Amino acid sequence: QNKPAVLVLPTMREIADMTETLRSVGLKPFAPTGAANGVYDGDFAVLNAQMAPADRYRAYLAISCGQVRCVLGTRAAMYAPVEGNALFLILDDVCYQDADGMMPYANARGVLRLRAKSHNGVFVAMANARSAQSQWETDAAHVGDTQVSGFSTPIHALPAVTKEASPWIRWLNRDELARLADPTIGARVPHTAVRILSKALETGPVLLSIPQDGITEALSCSKCHRQVRCARCTGPLERLADGTIRCRWCGAATVQWSCPTCHNERMRVVRVGAAGTAMELARLFRGVPMVLSTPSQPRGVVSDIGFAPQLVIATPGAEPRVRGESPAQCEYRAVAILDAWTSLYASGIDADVDTLTGWMRAVSLCAPRTRGGQALLIGETDPVLARSLMLWNSPMLAQVEVEDRAQTALPPVFAAACVWGRRDAVGTMLKRIGALAGGDMDTIDTIAGTMPSVLGPVPIPQPRTIDSRELEGTADRVKAVVRVPQGRRAELALRLRSASARHVASREPGELRFQMDPKERI
């Protein structure tokens, strides 16, 4: 339809994949034509922060004058100067790469949606797993034309197409292994999985997806192993150096804790990590070539592998692509997701959606069931997560997320803003915007009843920048979350901007910043 198009992708790996796809259908990238006069031409241009300044500015000019009407890029492409009723697309609309780390902390999703509204264009949010934000916006009860967005509608793949294109996905939890009479129940890789993966290795590569490298700690019930959460805001709890237990989100102290599931009163620390996975798997699959692809390894992320029997161990986002001579040789014969239980202890507000996105991304590299592809989810996890993966139905999880956030007064059902900086500066800003006791934004009405609009403030680490070290050693840098109904989101933003401007204009001491709807609340 001769419309300009802007596509924002998470990383350069996705840009390279999309560039190769566009080349395969006859489109050319913006590059020198080889003529003596040094002319550049092409059907699409790439914008990203890794480009040389001259190349980036040349592509920017070609886009602004209309020479190139299709733009690919990372977050930097959200400001591509296209005109007319353009098509604005974003892949993985809740990934952390979409958020700008500089003031005013613009998010690629919000910028593209606003531009689509202003240009009378179309905004499309694509992802392996639907985000809670997209689910809420496409809900019939919330669809409408606002100042920053137009009407939204959900798009689903047809069930018949999904079934044919996806592999056979099985969840090997304790109940399923007991039904199969597997003698290795409780093993990290049970005998049933070893047998399936060994058979798949006879005809091609096999992918094993493991959690991110590194060690993190989480508190869980010592009996049922469910993650310990705050009774006030459902945030994750942490144990401080002095033994005190508090919420990471609202800072509330926890005493006389009791598990709501099994009524146990004892906690345990769970350390989540992936060290030593390659050596452990080498003993299970002797004589099989192995490829390790993680950002922390000396070799780093492996971009691609050949179609040959080999075992590939990769963390989410670092899965190598399979390169072969035909489409049937550009896929893994089987995919296994190890340590599914780590999903029970993730602490981010989008933790389940991020987990499902990573699982679906890995499984999408597997051969479809029509060509014998199988995917295994190994370990205990939330049944909703497992069913969403097995049925390839991410809206199932997204709907549960929206319902949970309606009860806990969290975005997208409610609007939220983070305020952080020196303790007295944060307190002054909260008072000026009316979020403290006695103000007109001090409480919110939720399904569970009326509750304070502010979570926190809680202490946060000192910044890494040299020019903000005046609070070093004082533990006086804090963060708070302010929540309001979506109808008052614009009002909250204006109040925060006004209070921040007053802080700067009056030369009041101390760091003070705010951000609307950040991915990580605390």
Q: Which stretches of residues belong to each language-model region?
A:
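Conserved helicase ATPase motor motifs in RecA-like P-loop NTPase domains
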Residues: 96, 101-142, 146-158, 212, ...
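SF2 helicase catalytic motif II
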Residues: 77-119, 331-346
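Conserved interdomain linker/interface between the two RecA-like ATPase lobes of SF2 helicase motors
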Residues: 1, 124, 128-222
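Conserved RecA-like ASCE P-loop NTPase motor core of nucleic-acid helicases/translocases
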Residues: 3-11, 45-47, 206-211, 420
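Conserved motor-coupling elements within RecA-like helicase/translocase cores
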Residues: 36-71, 284, 291-314, 319-325
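Accessory helical-bundle/CTD segments and flexible terminal tails appended to RecA-like ATPase motors
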Residues: 1, 153, 158-181, 285, ...
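Conserved Walker A/P-loop ATP-binding site and its immediately adjacent core
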Residues: 4-26
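Cys/His-rich short segments
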Residues: 188-192, 196-286
